């Protein structure tokens, strides 16, 4: 007999895993979330939360927590294309174009007519702790950071998983009807045979995390 028996095992404690835990709890479905890292992300990652996302957060009692710490719409409601943020060269610090975006400025009434929820701007490094708190409040003891899935066996009725408590250096067995692979698609998703269809490698993108006083660029 397994040490833990739950309807759903969630592997991964990022945005997807934590929201899955919250939503299942709201539906009265018991789950266990395991995340191999000791804490939520230390990197900003994604930051824009559109109106539909905020509607779902509102439905599950999360929206107010996000709005309380998110960037006010008046501070992110424009998009500006520039050659650079600074520099003294002839092509530095030039603005190509500026437009309202994300429901700010001239777009406010249009966006407000579509939804009772405005969009928000909160980097993942600050969003995930909020989601973790809501998940833990709804499922005490069932959101386990520092616990890593190390093996699983699937059968007709579900999965039997082996989870390692990394701090205690011990393992335990979990039996679940369903397992959600919310680990970012680079580990257990591959082992499950989940593949991406269609063209890949369409473009390269680079994220840069920096601190700067950008007040000179704000209208």
Q: PLM features: residue spans?
A:
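A conserved short coil-to-beta-strand element within the FAD-binding core of flavoproteins
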Residues: 145-160
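General small-molecule cofactor/ligand-binding pocket signal
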Residues: 142-144, 197
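Conserved FAD-binding catalytic core of PHBH/FMO-like flavoproteins
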Residues: 133, 178-219
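N-terminal Rossmann-like FAD-binding beta1-loop-alpha1 element of flavoenzymes
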Residues: 3-33, 38
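Core beta-strand elements of the Rossmann-like FAD/NAD(P) dinucleotide-binding domain
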Residues: 4-6, 167-178
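Conserved structural-core and active-site-/substrate-pathway-adjacent residues in large, well-folded domains
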Residues: 10, 21, 31, 57, ...
């Amino acid at each position: 007999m397994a040490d833990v028996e739950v309807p759903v095992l969630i592997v991964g404690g990022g945005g997807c895993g934590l929201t899955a835990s919250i939503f299942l709890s709201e539906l009265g479905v018991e789950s266990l979330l395991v995340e191999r890292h000791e804490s939520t992300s230390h990197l900003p990652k994604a930051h824009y939360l559109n109106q539909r996302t905020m509607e779902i957060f509102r439905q599950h009692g999360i929206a107010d927590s996000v709005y309380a710490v998110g960037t006010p719409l008046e501070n992110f409601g424009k998009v500006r294309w520039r050659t650079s943020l600074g520099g003294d060269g002839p092509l530095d610090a030039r603005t190509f174009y500026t437009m309202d975006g994300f429901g700010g400025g001239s777009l406010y009434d249009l966006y407000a007519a579509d939804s009772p929820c405005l969009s928000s701007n909160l980097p993942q490094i600050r969003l995930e702790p909020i989601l973790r708190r809501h998940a833990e409040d709804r499922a005490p003891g069932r959101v386990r950071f520092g616990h890593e899935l190390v093996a699983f066996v699937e059968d007709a009725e579900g999965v039997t998983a082996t989870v390692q408590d990394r701090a205690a250096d011990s393992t335990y067995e979990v039996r679940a009807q369903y397992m959600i692979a919310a680990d970012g698609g680079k580990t257990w998703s591959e082992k499950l045979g989940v593949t991406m269809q269609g063209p890949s490698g369409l473009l390269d993108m680079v994220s840069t995390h920096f601190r700067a006083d950008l007040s000179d660029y704000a209208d």
